[in-house]
Amino acid sequence: MRAKQHISDLAHHCIAHGMRHLVISPGSRNAPLIRAFAASSQIECLSIVDERSAAFVALGLATELQAPVGVLCTSGTALLNYGPAIAEAYYLRAPLIVLSADRPARLVGQQDSQTICQDNLFANIVKGSYSLPEEPETVAELELSARVIAQAFSTALSPCFGPVHINIPLDEPLYGGELMAESLIALSPLQLAEPKGMSPALWQEVESAWRGAKRRMIVCGQGVADAELQALLARFAPDKTVTIIAENTANIVGPWLVDRPDAVLLACDEASRSLLAPDCLISFGGHLVAKHIKLLLREFKPAFHFRLDPAQMGIDTYQCLSAELDLAPTTFFRRLAQQVEPAAGFRDLWALPEGVAENQDDEFLVLKRLLGQLPAGSIAHLGNSMSVRHAQKLASRADLLYHSNRGVAGIDGCLSTAVGVALATDQLVLCCLGDLSFVYDSNALWNRNLPSNLRIVILNNQGGDIFRRLKGPSVSPGYQDFFVAHHPVQIGKMIEAYGVAYRRCLASEIDGFSEEFLGLQDGPLVLEVFVDPTKRD
């Protein structure tokens, strides 16, 4: 048996289980892992030095590809830098495979260099934590290693996607030795968990509640485009007792749904709000951006609320959960849509009133222009926190896809995630974010693989503009310094230091820049738009 045979096996087995992309940050302890993966022609390896950015790039790849993507680092604090992206992957449900090199157990806690306790480091934000055997010497130990890898991938991929952490203790020597062209150990098959379905009694309860309700609502949370799900939900169009809520991040579109629920609720008088609440609610998917629809459903609780979630995590966003159904949405609606009959009613109340004044924020008008001009098939990656909110005020385009890091909704990796998305597709990817978000994640541009289909628009409002809009911070001591946090960074010079093409304009000049900005380029392009933070609704 060759030295580090289990590392060669790890690379072969990760590839066999569907990993085709790996983002590597350099180090010494992970040298055997780097050698094993870099030697394979079946996986694309990207080198990104900053581990925090690297993990978000991997997250973007996994989100767009809907497939397992790996991220690999050395031991010590390098691994801690993966934390924000792992948390986002956990709540966004992305199949991120975290591979960390480690010291042997005998050296942990013994003042050895670059050593922390890495086992179960992310226990609360991964679906599973695993550790490979230290330097296995027997076939039985290698077979155990193969089973651990298969179990990790099974957990990451079923019943819903999510991140897993595989820790790999490595002893010296770390360099040299022969790499095996194939594994000596048979591949352990994946044991993918399937949704368990529903008992006949529970089906009867759900169908009875649905048929008996006069005001029925389906809330579609954040998700990826799914043609079958889209077609199934379209079957409810003739039945206006059914209102379907789907923001652009749900990637479900149609004239029969409500894509701007908060706009409707904000235009509604207080006395009429209760009429917009359903008797029976079906929900699925990830987070909503809209705040007021959540407040409505918590205040005027439906008699029945059924959430579709094979992960069975007990999520009760609206504080009125009747039952969590262990079914995929397509399976559920395939059956429920058989009962659709034309009817009038509830949905008409959710029509956006005519004559509602359009938002006149500089930021909103810039986003409206750019999102309106994006070529069909493009992807809009919406940064936290104002960019994604402004985008919810626009009608969803059926020919675009929408991404956003709404799992945890932090600003720390928006740009790096967009880079990963752009690396996974040939379509144009527009990343919209604010100046603080850009500066925070500017190391996303410290990347030799930046794709030419990436466009970045920075809405520079001189700080964290969301805090100017909230009543609390604006009357707090230190408001400008500690909430808005205006910064002195000259963003243009920063971008030029990374060697990326850069343009700048005022919000009022966007019409003269948008065509060039969204057109074909030889590389990525950044447009910094200076907006007036006082010009807002």
Swiss-Prot record:
EC number per UniProt: 2.2.1.9
Single Gene Ontology MF annotation: magnesium ion binding
Annotated metabolic or biological route of this protein: Quinol/quinone metabolism; 1,4-dihydroxy-2-naphthoate biosynthesis; 1,4-dihydroxy-2-naphthoate from chorismate: step 2/7; Quinol/quinone metabolism; menaquinone biosynthesis
Gene Ontology terms: biological process: menaquinone biosynthetic process
Needed co-factor(s): Mg(2+); Mn(2+); thiamine diphosphate
Statement: the UniProt record of this protein carries the keyword 4Fe-4S: no
Catalytically driven reaction(s): isochorismate + 2-oxoglutarate + H(+) = 5-enolpyruvoyl-6-hydroxy-2-succinyl-cyclohex-3-ene-1-carboxylate + CO2
Pfam families named in the record: TPP_enzyme_N
UniProt cofactor note: Binds 1 thiamine pyrophosphate per subunit.
CDD domains membership: TPP_PYR_MenD (cd07037), TPP_SHCHC_synthase (cd02009)
Alphabetized UniProt keyword annotations: Magnesium, Manganese, Menaquinone biosynthesis, Metal-binding, Thiamine pyrophosphate, Transferase
Quaternary state and interactors: Homodimer.
Recorded family membership: Belongs to the TPP enzyme family. MenD subfamily.
HAMAP family: MenD
Job of this protein: Catalyzes the thiamine diphosphate-dependent decarboxylation of 2-oxoglutarate and the subsequent addition of the resulting succinic semialdehyde-thiamine pyrophosphate anion to isochorismate to yield 2-succinyl-5-enolpyruvyl-6-hydroxy-3-cyclohexene-1-carboxylate (SEPHCHC).
PANTHER family for this protein: 2-SUCCINYL-5-ENOLPYRUVYL-6-HYDROXY-3-CYCLOHEXENE-1-CARBOXYLATE SYNTHASE (PTHR42916), PROTEIN PHYLLO, CHLOROPLASTIC (PTHR42916:SF1)
NCBIfam families per UniProt: menD
Protein name: 2-succinyl-5-enolpyruvyl-6-hydroxy-3-cyclohexene-1-carboxylate synthase
Source organism: Desulfotalea psychrophila (strain LSv54 / DSM 12343)
